[in-house]
Amino acid sequence: MADFLLRPIKQRHRNEDKYVSVDAADGSVSKIEPIADFVIKTKLLSANGPEKLQDGRKVFINVCHSPLVPKPEVDFNARIVFPLIIQNEWEIPIITSCYRMDHDKKGQECYVWDCCINSDCSRWICDDIQLREILVEWCLESCEIRDSVVLCRDRIAFPKMKKKGAELPALEVLNDELHQDYKAKMHKIIEEEAGDPMSILRGRNDDGDDNNDPDDGTLPPLFPIENKISGAKIEEIDKNEIAHRNLKQAPAPAPAPHEQQEDVPEYEVKMKRFKGAAYKLRILIENKAPNSKPDRFSPSYNFAENILYINGKLSIPLPRDIVVNAADIKIFHIRKERTLYIYI
């Protein structure tokens, strides 16, 4: 995630430009007064950081924008950008504040984050609903990284408000952060992500008991490869000895119980039609199996049958005349959530 960590400030600078650059002891910083756009509402599942946040509390994320925030090198074009997103080659930079306390309508304490993007990016997400949904996920991830928390994805809402709170605190960030190569930083974070504790759940590469199912990022062979036993000794035997051994050879032992368990997916499919949008249909596919690995999606489309197949185990008949060109089907995979978004 290409997020920039910063701290909010209480004072606001009332000047016509809405932001001002000042000199700090360790370099120049920029103070940004974000412009409110919309609000994401969810709840806190858990917190692992030094701050003592209470599980189950409501969370509000103010999505805002400013012309000072960097934007991607490539301007948004659906046909160009969505394939780049799938390859982790395009992302909207997000300046994420630390959390602050507030109260909901019932007077209960809640947590608020601010996620600020470039003003051009704000216009892009208004024009493309798929990019908007992707940005929502990026904002959730950015807040999680910022304060070491886990946010709920099952009950996300969008209240009819521009912002949560009386005002949006100004943001302060080093100019070096604003002008750094965020793309290089994004790739570095992606590489580091492979070594985080979650990789144990995804691949269990460090567990000797799961060596039969490695997840090292490589594709399995097309045809089965015979297992080779290393360290076997070479001995000279005759044909009679071979026949004698074959007769006495015991049947192969039954596999251990954990080897018999199959990764059986449990798919939940939701469809939603859109009128007057760039896409006519959105299909949300989520794997609810508790032990399923995050990267077990392999979608394919049969134009003659007008059926969408997932891993060869799930078939989804599509409405007539909804697929004009199979190349126009857009797929976005949120790996950690084991969720597949398909836009037609």
From Swiss-Prot:
Residues 207-216 have a biased composition (Acidic residues). It is found in: Cytoplasm; Nucleus. The keyword Cytoplasm applies. Its main location: cytoplasm. One of its GO terms (biological process) is rRNA processing. It comes from the Eukaryota. Keywords: Cytoplasm, mRNA processing, mRNA splicing, Nucleus. InterPro entries: PIH1/Kintoun_subfamily (IPR050734), Pih1_CS_Ascomycota (IPR041441), PIH1_N (IPR012981). The keyword Nucleus applies. GO terms for cellular component: cytoplasm; nucleus; R2TP complex; ribonucleoprotein complex. Residues 195-222 are annotated as: Disordered. Component of the R2TP complex composed at least of RVB1, RVB2, TAH1 and PIH1. Also interacts with HSP90, RRP43, NOP53 and NOP58. Present with 2610 molecules/cell in log phase SD medium. Involved in pre-rRNA processing and required for the NOP58-snoRNA interaction. Belongs to the PIH1 family. This is Protein interacting with Hsp90 1. It comes from Saccharomyces cerevisiae (strain ATCC 204508 / S288c) (Baker's yeast). The gene is PIH1.
